[in-house]
Each structure stands twice: as structure tokens, then as C-alpha cells.
């Protein structure tokens, strides 16, 4: 008995010593780290100021920091550069952390707006993508973790505190501080007819970038994804927002299928203890989705979704016209001011900042002319202007009444009425529409087949085949707007 007591006492002392020293047991997980990006961003640097030697050194430093960080916390870690990666490698690991760009296996047609493909459509390995890697590597797959804005600052907000990434296995200090709500978020909320508090609790993920780091481009700005339609499929979850230059619901940490977006792009050594723990927990959590593919694929990153209809209605108001006129004038004044400073500094032989260098070479722009409300509406939507003119209430009523029957135009950026659906009076996100369309096919009405092929990916020849498919899959069917205004099966 005395021996057992001594063993327990020794164990308690050892645990205490480990806690004090900051050490902890490694989590049993195999991780492949794919590096290749630097702790400086060439996009943010002045033209001609990128030092290739310094950039290469920064890549090496960041990879070393990530490798050390991961090996300290996981039992099996392999670190490679993006140029050495092939998708087949991920199958040997529980999770792949993408922090660098591999060699594309297929080049996209830039003239058609296509991106390069880095991962095959069949890719089902668990992956955590750091910052804009979500957009770079996931765009060709239809990843919802798209590039809404490369403007994620250093605070997380709107965290789902009950989510596993905030609760282990690595302990997270969730102590928040009250911080001012970002001005862009307040503006968007007003456009949406919503209100936000002037301050909200935020969690520090990493120290802010200094003025010198921002000016030189020696910083890694994070990326947020579009919230519109993000949650309209069962393979997604929003875990946290972040302080940024977009709406309050922009996605800073989220998951789409097997692809986990960790928007904060700072080096692990710069992350706070909470930030590091959340990243580690995200890697552990992502491993649970190994073998899962994307179900709803967002192939058009800018597709309009109905959750932003309030903003569409706001855009048809005099207030919106005044706002745009004022914004255009303010922006022009800012450009002229920076350009004047840049010219003066150049004439004096002084060094220009990256912003000044950009605006110095910018071609002369025509003067800003305020648009009348009628001119603004006519340019925005000529067809609706012919019907409603400058009647604000008529536009609002139009969108309110017809929203259930709307779908994107061919470009995907404007909502238009689907005449076949409107004629039936059944919303396109109501599964009764498919039942009715099959009935129309049975009656010989061509609208039935048109509707079925417009809102599903199936191409059956007979009503009986359509009905059999619908009856089998009905319990698992869902409607996705971000995925193309389609009825899909959760499988």
C-alpha cells in the first residue's frame, strides 16, 4: 500500500513538473506538413522590392518553425516543400497541413477564369489549409473556403466556444477582451438591416503587425471566406469569425468536407498560446474527416445567395446611391493625395512605400461625377428600371415577393425569377417542386423535365425513373445555393 501511495505521489509531482515546465505528452497523430510560403508576402511588397534571397530565407525559417511546432506536439511528422508534394502522399498520414503550393497537375485556362488544379476531384484526405491556401488549392475542387478577403487581422470573434477545437486535447485559454467592432462589419450590418454592438469579445490569436512590417510586406495577412451559403450543405461548419475588412460573419475558421480552413496565417512562433492550441486542436479535429469528400461543390465563388437579399434591396435605395457617390469621391481623394505625396518624395529622391509606388504609376483617372438616383438604378439593372423607375418600395416588394422563385443569372451575380417555378407557386428550395415536376412529365408537359434538370444533376429519361430516384433518396436530400441552386443527396 505504502509503495502504491509513493507511486501516485511521484506521478502527481511529475505531472506538476510537466505543467510548470509547459511540457505535455504528444498526441498520437501522423501529420504531413507541406511548406513553401514565407513569413513575408510578395503581394504586399513594393514593385521591385522583393529580395529573392531574403524570400527564400523566410520560407526556410517558416518551414523550420512549423516543423518544430508540429514535432513537439504530434508523434509522427513529415515536412516537405510544396514542389515535392504529390496528392498520393497524403494517404499515408492522418492529416496534411498545407502551407505551401504544390506543382499543379493541370493548368487552368486563365482567359476563361479557370484556376490551376493542385488536388484531384477524388481527393478525400483530411487537410488543414493555412490562410489563402484554402483558395489556391481548393478552388478547382469547389471548396467553400474561398477568397472573400485577404484582410483577416489578429483577433478571432464569434467563436463557437463549445466546438472541439476550443476544448482539447490541447488546452485553450479562451480569455477574451472587449474590442471595437470593425467599421466594415458595422457598415455591412446596416446594409443588411441588422445592428451590431460597438464592441464585442475577441480572442487574440497573434500580436498585431507593426507599421514597419506592414509597410515592408514582412507580414502574413490571413484570409476569410464568404459566409453566403456556407452552411447550406451538411458537410460544412463555421467555427469562428475574425476581425477583418468584411462582414461580421466572414469565415475565419471553418470546415467543408475534408478541407479545414485555418484563416490565421501567422507563423506558429508568432501565435499566442491560445492561437497555437487552437491550430493544434484544428489539426486533430480535421483528422476525423479523413476519407470524406465534398458533397456540395461551390464552383462559382461569387455566386449570389438569397441570405444577402436584404443587401440587394438596400442597393435599390437612395441611401445606397448616396453612399456609393460619397465612397467614390473619398476614394478618389485618397488616390490623389497619395499620388501627390509619391511624386513629391520621388522628386526629392526619397524611398517610396509600397502603396506610394503603386499609386505613382497609376494612370490618370477621369474626375468623379455624382450619379443621380435614376442613372444609378438604370446602370445597375436596366430591365428592372424600365418597370419600377425610381420607386424604392417597388424594388423591395419585387424581391420580397419573388425571392422563393429566384435563381442566379448566367453569370451567377444577380438573382432573377425562374418563370417555370414561379408559375407553379412552389419555392425552388421546397422538395415538393420535384414531385410536381415529375407530375408535369407524366402529363407530357416539357416544363417538368426542364425543372428537374435545372435543379438536380440527374438526367433520367422517364418519369418513373425520376420518381424512383426521388423516393429512394428523399430523406437525405438537401438544397444548396452556394453549390449551384441544386437538390443534392447527402451521401
Q: Predicted regions span which residues?
A:
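Sec-dependent N-terminal signal peptides
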Residues: 9-18
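Helical hinge/lid and interdomain linker segments adjacent to catalytic or ligand-binding clefts
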Residues: 30-139, 426
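An acidic, glycine-rich "communication" segment
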Residues: 129-234
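Extracellular ligand-binding/catalytic regions of CAZymes and related secreted enzymes
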Residues: 26-27, 231-404
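Positively charged n-region of N-terminal signal peptides that target proteins for export
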Residues: 1-9
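Short, flexible loop/turn segments with low-complexity composition
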Residues: 15, 292-305, 463-468, 481-485
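Long, helix-rich interaction regions
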Residues: 153-161, 337-491
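C-terminal segment of classical bacterial N-terminal signal peptides
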Residues: 18-24
Amino acid at each position: 500500500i505504502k509503495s502504491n501511495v509513493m507511486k501516485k505521489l511521484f506521478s502527481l509531482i511529475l505531472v506538476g513538473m510537466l505543467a510548470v515546465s509547459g511540457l505535455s505528452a504528444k498526441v498520437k497523430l501522423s501529420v504531413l506538413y507541406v511548406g513553401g510560403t514565407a513569413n513575408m508576402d510578395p503581394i504586399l511588397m513594393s514593385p521591385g522590392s522583393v529580395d529573392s534571397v531574403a524570400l527564400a530565407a523566410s520560407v526556410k525559417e517558416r518551414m523550420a518553425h512549423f516543423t518544430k511546432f508540429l514535432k513537439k506536439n504530434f508523434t509522427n511528422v513529415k515536412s516537405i516543400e510544396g514542389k515535392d508534394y504529390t496528392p498520393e502522399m497524403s494517404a499515408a498520414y492522418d492529416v496534411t497541413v498545407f502551407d505551401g503550393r504544390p506543382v499543379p497537375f493541370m493548368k487552368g485556362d486563365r482567359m476563361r477564369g479557370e484556376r490551376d488544379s493542385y488536388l484531384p476531384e477524388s481527393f478525400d484526405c483530411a487537410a488543414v489549409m493555412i490562410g489563402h491556401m484554402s483558395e489556391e488549392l481548393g478552388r478547382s475542387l469547389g471548396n467553400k473556403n474561398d477568397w472573400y478577403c485577404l484582410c483577416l487581422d489578429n483577433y478571432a470573434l464569434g467563436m463557437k466556444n463549445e466546438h472541439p477545437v476550443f476544448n482539447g486535447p490541447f488546452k485553450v485559454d479562451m480569455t477574451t477582451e472587449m474590442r471595437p467592432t470593425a467599421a466594415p462589419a458595422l457598415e455591412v450590418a446596416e446594409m443588411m438591416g441588422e445592428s451590431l454592438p460597438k464592441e464585442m469579445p475577441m480572442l487574440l490569436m497573434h500580436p498585431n503587425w507593426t507599421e514597419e512590417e506592414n509597410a515592408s510586406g514582412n507580414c502574413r495577412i490571413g484570409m476569410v471566406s464568404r459566409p453566403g451559403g456556407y452552411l447550406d450543405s451538411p458537410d460544412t461548419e463555421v467555427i469562428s469569425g475574425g476581425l477583418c475588412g468584411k462582414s461580421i460573419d466572414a469565415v475565419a475558421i471553418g470546415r467543408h468536407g475534408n478541407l479545414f480552413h485555418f484563416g490565421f496565417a501567422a507563423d506558429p512562433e508568432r501565435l499566442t498560446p491560445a492561437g497555437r492550441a487552437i491550430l493544434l486542436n484544428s489539426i486533430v479535429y480535421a483528422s476525423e474527416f479523413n476519407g470524406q469528400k465534398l458533397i456540395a461543390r461551390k464552383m462559382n465563388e461569387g455566386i449570389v445567395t438569397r441570405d444577402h437579399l436584404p443587401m440587394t434591396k438596400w442597393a435599390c435605395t437612395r441611401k445606397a446611391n448616396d453612399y456609393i457617390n460619397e465612397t467614390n469621391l473619398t476614394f478618389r481623394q485618397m488616390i490623389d493625395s497619395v499620388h501627390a505625396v509619391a511624386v513629391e518624395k520621388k522628386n526629392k529622391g526619397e524611398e517610396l512605400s509600397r502603396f506610394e509606388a503603386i499609386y505613382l504609376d497609376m494612370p490618370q483617372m477621369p474626375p468623379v461625377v455624382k450619379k443621380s438616383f435614376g442613372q444609378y438604378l438604370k446602370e445597375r439593372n436596366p430591365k428592372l428600371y424600365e418597370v419600377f423607375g425610381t420607386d424604392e418600395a417597388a424594388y423591395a416588394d419585387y424581391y420580397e415577393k419573388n425571392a422563393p422563385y429566384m435563381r442566379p443569372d448566367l453569370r451567377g451575380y444577380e438573382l432573377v425569377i425562374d418563370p417555370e417555378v414561379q408559375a407553379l407557386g412552389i419555392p425552388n428550395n421546397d422538395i415538393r417542386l420535384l414531385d410536381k415536376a415529375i407530375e408535369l412529365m407524366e402529363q407530357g408537359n416539357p416544363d417538368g423535365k426542364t425543372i428537374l434538370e435545372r435543379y438536380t444533376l440527374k438526367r433520367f429519361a422517364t418519369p418513373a425513373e425520376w420518381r424512383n430516384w426521388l423516393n429512394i433518396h428523399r430523406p437525405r436530400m438537401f438544397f444548396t445555393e452556394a453549390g449551384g441552386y441544386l437538390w443534392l443527396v447527402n451521401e
